[in-house]
Curated annotation (Swiss-Prot):
It holds the Pfam family C2. The keyword Cell inner membrane does not apply. Residues 147-264, 278-399 form the C2 domain. Residues 1-4 are extracellular. InterPro entries: C2_dom, C2_domain_sf, Synaptotagmin-15/17_C2A. This is Synaptotagmin-15. Keywords: Cell membrane, Membrane, Repeat, Signal-anchor, Transmembrane, Transmembrane helix. Neither C2 domains mediates Ca(2+)-dependent or -independent phospholipid binding. One of its GO terms (biological process) is regulation of calcium ion-dependent exocytosis. Homodimer. GO terms for molecular function: calcium ion sensor activity; calcium-dependent phospholipid binding; SNARE binding.
Length: 421
């Protein structure tokens, strides 16, 4: 019995030792194979001869020579050289390039072969700055015909402090009424047009650099209903302010997404000097894409609205309806803007309309005020379409849209009081 027990114990110990020996052998074999998986190949004689004849120093990309190789000399793979200390410096054109230090041989010193042999070995892994250029920014060079100027600014909203941070960066291509231009900018947070913040006056320049920062205290509940307005003026010798143009920027939800500030540029628009119509005016764009059979309407803003007195919160929206043979086809609505007789929307809507339907189709844009409860009140309406339904400016707007396919045609229209179709 004792002999059998001794045999069992001896067999168990022997088996464990055998397993340990096998495991150690496997580990050593894997390490040995890993050292032979990749290895750098020596430079070709052509490389050495060329480098010596040109008087160049030894460079970090040249591999160390070895007397014996464990692999055939025709292996078409080498380990790319490690590039260290590579610095990048910014260029004035908005591109980035590496510093002058060159850790690799010049391309003319390396023989080039179509078979991808050892002559291209040192170029593997090198960075080509041409592949990492930033796209050219044409916002400072491309100005449309009749441009009044362009304004750059930044917007950031601090949710916890309920502060709107506005950065006035610069303006370019300002069109002054005289030879010299001395611009300043007034900032409003609509619908409040009584209070404003003002920049410093820049003397004798049509391309002023402001770099000023302004703070508006505004609640997070109403921030998406506000509109940032920039009015750019020229200050003449009598210190009178002459309006050069303005920019309206609605603070929609997508504008304030994220914690970082957003840099924007906008072209200046001329302020309409015509007095508001009896029931107010509505500005919108029309465009038709004949290839996609798509009719696009961009509701921009309204002015001089006759709001109905109401104890509740006043909000105004625009309803856009597509009609065909005076029959309702489809309707879309803008978001409601609170407490302003000059609301700004900047919202785009698209309708499906074949080219054969445009002779009988029309668009009805109705400005509606929300009342207490579920009630609403029409403030005014404008209809644009072919000769069958409209005349005057409304017909001209429709015809201009058809004559300029795929272009946005913008116009003001007077609202008229009429019953809803």
């Amino acid at each position: 019995m004792a002999e059998q027990l001794a045999l069992v114990i001896g067999g168990t110990i022997g088996g464990l030792l055998l397993l340990l020996l096998i495991g150690a052998s496997c580990c050593l074999w894997r390490r040995f194979c890993a050292t032979l998986t990749y290895e750098e190949l020596p430079g070709t004689p052509a490389m050495a001869t060329t480098a010596a004849s040109s008087g160049q120093r030894d460079r970090p990309c040249q591999p160390h020579a070895r007397t014996q190789l464990s692999r055939p000399p025709a292996v078409p793979f080498v380990v790319p050289p490690t590039l260290q200390g590579r610095d990048w410096v910014p260029l004035h054109s908005g591109e980035w390039a590496d510093a002058p230090w060159d850790p690799c041989p010049a391309s003319e010193l390396l023989p080039h072969t179509s078979s991808g042999g050892l002559g291209d070995a040192c170029m593997v892994g090198a960075i080509n700055p041409e592949l990492y250029k930033f796209p050219e920014d044409k916002s400072e060079t491309d100005f449309p015909d009749g441009c009044l100027g362009r304004l750059w600014f930044s917007v950031e909203y601090e949710q916890e402090a309920e502060r709107l941070l506005v950065g006035l960066i610069k303006a370019q291509h300002l069109q002054a009424p005289s030879e010299t231009c001395s611009p300043l900018v007034k900032l409003y947070l609509l619908p409040d047009e009584r209070r404003f913040l003002q920049s410093k006056t820049k003397r004798k320049t049509s391309n002023p650099q402001f770099d000023e920062h302004f703070i508006f205290q505004v609640s997070s509940k109403t921030i998406t209903q506000r509109v940032l307005k920039f009015s750019v003026y020229h200050v003449d010798r009598q210190r009178k302010h002459q309006l050069l143009g303005q920019v309206l920027f609605p603070l929609k939800n997508e504008t304030l997404v994220g914690d970082c500030r957003r840099v924007i540029w906008r072209d200046l628009e001329a302020e309409s000097l015509e007095p508001p119509s009896e029931f107010g005016d509505l500005q919108f764009c029309l465009s038709y894409n004949d290839y996609l059979s798509r009719l696009t309407v961009v509701v921009l803003r309204a002015k001089g609205l006759r709001l109905q007195e109401d104890r509740g919160i006043v909000s105004v929206f625009v309803k856009v309806s597509l009609m065909n043979h005076n029959k309702f086809v489809k309707c879309k609505k803008t978001s409601a803007v609170l407490g302003s007789i000059n609301p700004v929307y900047n919202e785009t809507f698209s309708f499906k309309a074949d080219a054969t339907e445009l002779d009988t189709a029309s668009l009805s844009l109705t400005v509606v005020q929300n009342m207490e409860g579920d009630k609403s009140q029409q403030l005014g309406r404008v209809v644009v379409g072919p000769y069958m339904y409209t005349r005057g400016r409304e017909l001209e707007h429709w015809d201009e849209m058809l004559s300029k396919p795929k272009e946005l045609v913008k116009r003001w229209h007077a609202l008229c009081r009429t019953t809803e179709p």
